[in-house]
Amino acid sequence: MARKDDVTGEGPVTGNSVSDSNQKTNRRFKRNLHEKRFYIPSEDRHVKLKVSSKTLKTINKKGIQAVLEEARKQGYDV
């Protein structure tokens, strides 16, 4: 199961863990993903999407229909 946002396609990013002695080691910053169920009135159905908290805020602001239209234009199969 990929740790990717179903709407934006964003996955984990890489960076460094920095200790007190300033020694750096590689690490991954994982997305804050949640599996949510959304109702799409125009299609009269529910969809289950794995979305990050950032995407969830965008959906609350713009609405699920507008966000899905943008994602489909960018080539994501939602």
From Swiss-Prot:
Polar residues bias: start-end ranges: 14-24
MF (Gene Ontology): structural constituent of ribosome
Gene Ontology cellular component list: ribonucleoprotein complex; ribosome
Database matches in Gene3D superfamilies: Ribosomal protein L28/L24 (2.30.170.40)
GO-annotated biological processes: translation
Pfam families in the record: Ribosomal_L28
Keyword annotations of the record: Ribonucleoprotein, Ribosomal protein
Region: Disordered, residue numbers: 1-33
HAMAP family found in the cross-reference section: Ribosomal_bL28 (MF_00373)
PANTHER family tied to this protein: 39S RIBOSOMAL PROTEIN L28, MITOCHONDRIAL, LARGE RIBOSOMAL SUBUNIT PROTEIN BL28M
Family: Belongs to the bacterial ribosomal protein bL28 family.
Name of the protein this chain belongs to: Large ribosomal subunit protein bL28
Originating organism: Salinibacter ruber (strain DSM 13855 / M31)
